[in-house]
A protein has these predicted regions:
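Acidic/aromatic-lined carbohydrate-recognition and catalytic surfaces
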Residues: 2-230
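Catalytic cores of eukaryotic secretory-pathway lumenal/extracellular enzymes that build
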Residues: 232-236
Length: 236
């Protein structure tokens, strides 16, 4: 950042206007960047972008490195042809435009994102494969963690079966085979998040707007980071 004084606005991505339950990387985000520029501002401060866990707080995340799938723009997926306007409009995201109904958001948005994944034919997408390779150092553990968490009905990893809780190699191999498509779905959501976020960030920077990010102070106990790297933490 510049040594000169700067002025900006703190606005969580989730607070941007949206008819699909939560603010995201849609046209509203670009409109906000334009509004900042017109107002003579030079900074946009946001809250952490990680996938939220229990309590839906951005400061308690399932991963230090992953992005929140809720922020993926459904409008962009409609433009890509992997979702339809009718499908998105048919989902109940809640009736209060001033607040986020996370229960309905989780149910509805994940269903739509899964449809987009199934229609995307990511296996033939070279950009997706390159993303998998370049981000494998965190992505493989995160995607497996989220897939196994779903298999165990959302329970924290400390309550999973012993073999996968302790990451025995035979268990890791088994779940990677058994949950292949769910793992790929998790990776697809991270791919779309990264793609859309970098596009928005590049646009903001081109308009002279810098992004001030934020991260949680601590790594969450129930996270892919802790599960995959237990030797880095003091665990009971």
């Amino acid at each position: 950042m510049s040594d000169k004084r700067q002025c900006g606005v703190l606005l969580p991505v989730s607070s941007l206007p949206s008819k699909y339950g939560i603010g995201c990387f849609s046209k509203s985000a670009y409109d906000f960047v334009d509004a900042l520029k017109v107002a003579g501002q030079s900074c946009w401060q946001i809250l952490p972008l990680g996938p939220t866990s229990y309590g839906d707080s951005p400061y308690q995340s399932f991963s230090t490195f992953a992005g929140n799938p809720y922020f993926i723009s459904l409008e962009d997926l409609i433009e890509e042809g992997v979702l339809t306007q009718k499908e998105c409009d048919a989902v109940d995201f809640g009736s209060d435009p001033a607040s986020v109904d996370y229960a309905k958001l989780y149910k509805g948005r994940i269903i739509l994102l899964r449809k987009a994944y199934e229609r995307s034919n990511v296996g033939e997408n070279e950009e997706f494969r390159r993303f998998q390779e370049e981000e494998a150092w965190w992505l493989k553990d995160y995607a497996l963690f989220m897939a196994v968490k779903q298999r165990f009905e959302g329970k924290p990893w400390s309550e999973w079966a012993e073999d996968i809780r302790l990451r025995w190699q035979n268990a890791l191999d088994y779940y990677r085979r058994e949950l292949y498509f769910e793992i790929e779905f998790q990776e697809y959501m991270q791919f779309k998040f990264r793609q859309q976020w970098m596009k928005l960030k590049a646009y903001a920077n081109k308009q002279g707007i810098e992004i001030i990010g934020d991260i949680p102070i601590y790594v969450a106990m129930d996270s892919a980071d802790t599960w995959a790297n237990p030797w880095l933490f003091k665990l009971d």
